[in-house]
Amino acid sequence: MKDYEYQPLSPGEIRLLRLEAARPDQPLSGSILHHRLRNPVYHPRAEDDGGGYLEHALAYEAISYHWGSDQRTPFHVVIDNGSVIRITASLHTVLRRLALPDGPRVLWADAICINQVTSADNREKGEQIQLMPDIYRIASRVQVYLGPEADDLALALDFIRSIADYSEYLDASQHDDGETATALAQQRGFVLPPVGDPRWTALRAFLRRPWFRRVWIIQEFVYATDVAVTCGDHDVDWHLLWLCAKAYADNRQLIYTGYSPDLFGTRRLDLFREAHEGARGMLVVTDLRMRAWGYMTPAYMILSLNEKRDKENFSGLSIRKDLNTIKDYERFARAKLLHDRAEGETFPFGRPDMLQLLRRTSNFLATQPVDRLYALLGLTGTDHIKPVYSEQQTLNVVATKFAAHFITKGSMSEVLSTAGIRSATPSPNDPPSWVPNWTKMTYSQDMQIGFNRLADIQDEKNADRDKGGEKPAEGGETTSDEARAKDIDRLYSASGDLPQSFHINEIEASLTVKVTPIDRVVLVLPGKLCLGIPMYLGMTQKLGPVYPNGQPIEEAFWRTLIGNRTWNGLPVPDRYAVQYENLKRHESNLLTRAMLLLAIAALIALPFVTIAIRCIPFTGHVGLVTAAVAWKVSTVSGVVLPGIVYLILLPLFRWLWVTALVPLLVVIAWYLMVKVYPLLFLDALKYLGVTTAASIGSVPQDCTEYLSSFMVMGNRHNLAFTESRLMGLLPLLTKEGDIVAIVHGCHAPFVMRPTRRQGYYKLVGECYVHGVMNGELAASESIDIALC
């Protein structure tokens, strides 16, 4: 049969599939309807039956599912004129489940109802994407299909219900000490399955289902008036998924119970991380829906006050967030919800911010990278940017358009803080360095709140406090940390009160900004802050006993390691100095152990190296050196010369007695590590576990807060020094010769790299430089530069 020929749609029209009744052994068939979207009519009822109902001109159900990695279309739906629409296996499974045995069903599915193939320049696709918020809002129900029965699904759903029942206690973000969350839940009856229990495997397999991280499902789920979730043959209450995700996302015991490091590679770690990302994705989607309904608004908090609050021994349950409370509020708010949906309003309490959404959804996936941006437009009301699919609207063009829009709206600090060069060897096809890489998938565990963003958050809190919107801590008193935060106007203020000054050149895609240069980078230490405090301290103390701002060098050092802030973005309390000393002691022990392991490994390897030198033919050594050069030539400068020297000295090595050869090899190994490849050696040393910051399990209790702040920085920055003996946390791609400068209107400095073109620079990324973060150099001479 021939393929179905799509007919053009009029403005405001969509297609619907009228799926005819079908038994499992019958082919799927139906017809395509053209339907003009109209808001439903709200009918209130006097009796308490859930707030009334919506009357639709044509009731239909919208489908939310994961397309799957297999894009082949071996199945089809027979359309009434004898043609067919070819569909993927995943959509075929969904339609089979939804086909009624005794009557038709009207459905909307993107792969069928949008002409994504033959429309000119994908124009229709862009137009229909703009209608998708209304498509899902007006649908009588949204049918969510999470996937087929697999991986002990029933066991996973049972465990999810158990976690959801104790979610308030298991949610570590609700407690001052996250490590106590599981203990609190266990005191109230929660049973933590032992290591090796099949429930862990089943739960993590469920969390890894791709629907939870498909970027398009966000608006599909949030806009839905009513949702039905199925997985395999099971109906799933999405509220339980939300409660489970809230608990799992921040509870280290739930995340890592049963984890053991991989002997080779990171496969096992990746499985655990993917499960955590699934929980994070589920939390983002369900939380956005909850807040669109009014979750955590004053009305919700009044209705949900915990009358048993005084009987609890912690502050996390002042507002109830259990299943019954959530559903009670939904029943209370349903009349307003239905009325708002009939009026075309989905976000009566305010739309999400686009930049915030881009941060929160960094771990979501899309088949086309540009959809990471387009799929969020319908949630934020960014009407002036339209989804256009054409050869001219490349990903770089679209991303630059988004960045320029945010900057002109006053968010330059936040845009630049997430931007920077993409690799050590930039390509001519790269977008401008001042445009963030919003389409790169980043694990939420690898995300951090940047230095500029932290200052923005502090500004927002101060604004709320000035408006009288900030609430005191429980008991009517503020905590010491909160009081300390109120004593400062801003956590970071490198540019002082200097206003933003910028110009966007759309033709050459450059951003001209006014900056105050600080200094030139002269040394970047390796290891991504994972070499351990003793190693870095020893290198830092070579600067002298006193830092340029007058602080003792070690105090400046430990403050720099954490960006001079707590893990949650508050000023550093005095107790952090003691916790730093405790952490230094722990890591000194780890370093000693690592060096012993290294020495033992060297002693074990020495006889084998000696035998290899004496017994392997000369041609074999030539082959080994050639392989080593081929493997390392792209990452290690000067690797060819040592290889040649080794081959020249090989006859001498063979001639020497073993008693002379062994000490000589030890001396050569030491020389190579200390003199020839010191940075490479230090970079390799981090894999021996010389820092507690790389720990996945529990952490020492006598330094938990400082270590948590330090862990935020680990693997994201390198410790570096400038010509004027300033030190700071700089982006991983920073090189000697880069420039540190303050961009006017931004809270933290940036690292920039000069280009061959005078006055043009590549943005490397934001940074923390100790001693310049509070406007100390803001009054210095400024210049205009162009970021390209």
Regions found by a protein language model. Give the residues of each.
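Short acidic catalytic loops
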Residues: 63, 101-125, 136, 142-146, ...
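A general alpha-helical scaffold signature found inside nucleotide-binding enzyme cores
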Residues: 86-89, 127-131
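Short, well-ordered alpha-helix to beta-strand connector turns
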Residues: 139-140, 225
